[in-house]
Every structure is written in structure tokens, then in C-alpha cells.
């Protein structure tokens, strides 16, 4: 079984904690290997056919700084044949007009480079007005709001991972 590479960017540590929880839900580091994009060469994305991309939305709809620094370098990675799931951290109350935008920006870019998106997540249960991560009434990946709905995070991660396992052949 090939490992899943989980690449995340984090400003305050929240997205790293979410990445660790996702890794644990999959069964640990034998299945999911974690990479902080601040500390790894973007070339490492090439080593995995199955990826999970994690990014918080920062400020007003912006990419987290490490993902922003790597954004143009993504053009040098061929994502054809790669299965990719996304998760994002955001604040649906304070930033209802751009909730999870960073996740949507990364998904759009990587899809344009050949990546196949899996793990779409329902928008029901969230209170936001607009999101670049919304496609056909669903988020492109798991939307986490630790600011306003922390009590739902563990349950959402478990349900999302259960949805992803068949898509990743587990």
C-alpha cells in the first residue's frame, strides 16, 4: 500500500493539529505522512499518487503565507494521475464572504494541473455567504471552523476520512 502525503501550511498551529487528527483517523504515520510546506521542497508532492492538501484561509480570503510562497511553483508539478483531497480551516462568522477561500484557490490550481479531486463536503451546517471553495453546492474538501464549531471537528474528520478511504483504495 502506498502512503498518502498530507501537505499542510499553518500560521498558528491549528492546521497542523488538524493534519495530525486526520493522520490519526487514517490509522497513523504508516498510512499518512505529514509535511509542513514551510519545511519541505515542493518536489516532495511528486512522490505521492495520493495527496491531502491542508490550508487555512488567512486574513480576508488569502492563502496561508507558506502556500502563497509556493503557489507559482505548483505549476512545475504534474498532478496528472494524482488523487487529491483538501481540507481547510476558516472562520465562517467573521469571514462569511470568503469562508474557506484558500482551499478553493489551491483546489482550482491543482485541478488545472491535472489533479483529481475527491472528498467533497456538504455545505449544510455552515453559515457563510460566499466561498471560492464551493462547487455545485458542496465544498471541494473538508471545511473546519475551530473558531465557531470546535465541537464538530472530530466528528467531521472521522466522517470525511471514512469517505476518503475508498477513494484512496483503503
From Swiss-Prot:
**Pfam families in UniProt:** Flavodoxin_1
Tell me its cofactors.
FMN
GO MF terms listed in the record are: electron transfer activity; FMN binding
Q: What induces it?
A: By iron stress.
Q: Which cysteines are joined by disulfide bonds?
A: none
Gene3D superfamilies linked to this entry: 3.40.50.360
The answer to whether keyword Electron transport applies is: yes
Alphabetically sorted, this entry's keywords are: Electron transport, Flavoprotein, FMN, Stress response, Transport
Flavodoxin-like domain segment(s): 4-165
Which PROSITE patterns does UniProt cross-reference here?
FLAVODOXIN (PS00201), FLAVODOXIN_LIKE (PS50902)
Source domain of life is Bacteria
According to its UniProt entry, what is the function of this protein? Answer: Low-potential electron donor to a number of redox enzymes.
NCBIfam families to which the protein is assigned, alphabetical: flav_long, PRK09267.1-2, PRK09267.1-5
Similarity annotation = Belongs to the flavodoxin family.
This chain belongs to the protein called Flavodoxin
Q: What is the lineage of its organism?
A: Bacteria, Bacillati, Cyanobacteriota, Cyanophyceae, Oscillatoriophycideae
Amino acid at each position: 500500500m502506498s502512503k498518502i502525503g498530507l501537505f499542510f501550511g499553518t500560521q498558528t498551529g491549528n492546521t497542523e493539529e488538524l493534519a495530525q487528527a486526520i493522520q490519526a483517523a487514517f490509522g497513523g504515520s504508516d498510512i499518512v505522512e505529514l509535511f509542513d510546506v514551510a519545511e519541505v521542497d515542493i518536489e516532495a508532492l511528486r512522490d505521492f499518487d495520493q495527496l491531502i492538501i491542508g490550508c487555512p484561509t488567512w486574513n480576508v480570503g488569502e492563502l496561508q503565507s507558506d502556500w502563497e510562497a509556493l503557489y507559482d511553483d505548483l505549476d512545475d508539478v504534474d498532478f496528472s494521475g494524482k488523487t487529491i483531497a483538501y481540507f481547510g480551516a476558516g472562520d465562517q462568522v467573521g469571514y462569511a464572504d470568503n469562508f474557506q477561500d484558500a482551499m478553493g484557490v489551491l483546489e482550482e490550481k491543482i485541478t488545472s494541473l491535472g489533479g483529481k479531486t475527491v472528498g467533497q463536503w456538504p455545505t449544510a451546517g455552515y453559515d457563510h455567504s460566499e466561498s471560492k471553495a464551493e462547487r455545485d453546492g458542496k465544498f471541494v474538501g473538508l471545511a473546519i471552523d475551530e473558531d465557531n464549531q470546535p465541537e464538530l471537528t472530530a466528528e467531521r474528520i472521522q466522517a470525511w476520512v471514512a469517505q476518503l478511504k475508498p477513494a484512496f483504495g483503503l
